[in-house]
Curated annotation (Swiss-Prot):
The gene is pycTM. Keywords: Antiviral defense, Cell inner membrane, Cell membrane, Membrane, Nucleotide-binding, Transmembrane, Transmembrane helix. GO terms for biological process: defense response to virus. This is Pycsar effector protein GmPycTM. GO terms for molecular function: nucleotide binding. InterPro entries: PycTM (IPR043760). It is found in: Cell inner membrane. Pfam families: PycTM.
Length: 196
């Protein structure tokens, strides 16, 4: 690469700042999506546990299971067992979905997990390291920082936040996939409840 095509230090810093802003936007975007998914899961669970039709059907299911005896028709026993299995599957899918979504929503500020050469560990940009300093110490760090160290700090934050963003979206996507599966099972379960 020729020297005239290389970015200057100020251009590198500006690009890093813009990239960091974009990544932070995507992190915020993912948190918003997770919040909407959690709200949907809450509505689904709220509807499940507060609906008179569903609670009535659950009571009928439990009563039907308790009253199974040698005179109960085989198909009725099978239907009650399958309905119970579908109910358990719905609950498990919902728990898995909520676990992924809450893990995605959880903040991650442990920079200790990012141990790579040249990665800035004493950042003047990251609130987690700033809050560990006194104001005087932080102020002196900002005043005394060299240009190349500041650029490295920005690039480090871009790298770390990219990792955080990727983790959030991975957990969000898994959570949504499990939520979709639990919604489908919820619909099937409601259909099965109609025939109890």
């Amino acid at each position: 690469m020729s020297e005239e095509n290389k970015l200057s230090e100020s251009e590198i810093k500006e690009e890093a700042v813009q990239t960091l802003e974009r990544i932070n936007f995507w992190i915020s975007n993912c948190d918003t999506k997770i919040s909407f998914s959690l709200a949907f899961a809450g509505i689904l669970l709220g509807g499940f546990f507060s609906s008179g039709i569903i609670t009535g059907s659950l009571n009928k299911l439990m009563k039907g299971l308790k009253e199974i005896d040698k005179d109960t028709p085989y198909l009725k026993i099978q239907y009650l067992e399958i309905t119970t299995i579908v109910l358990v599957v719905f609950i498990i899918l919902m728990i898995v979905s909520l676990t992924y979504l809450f893990r995605g929503k959880k903040g991650s500020i442990d920079t200790g997990v990012f141990n790579e050469a040249d990665l800035s560990k004493d950042s003047i940009l990251f609130f987690g390291t700033i809050q560990n300093k006194s104001f005087i110490s932080f102020k002196n760090s900002v005043i005394e920082i060299k240009k190349d160290d500041l650029v490295n700090d920005y690039l480090s934050q871009v790298y770390i936040n990219s990792k955080i963003c990727n983790r959030k979206f991975t957990l969000y996507n898994k959570g949504v996939n499990w939520l979709i599966a639990s919604t489908i099972v919820f619909i099937i379960l409601n259909g099965m409840f109609l025939f109890l």
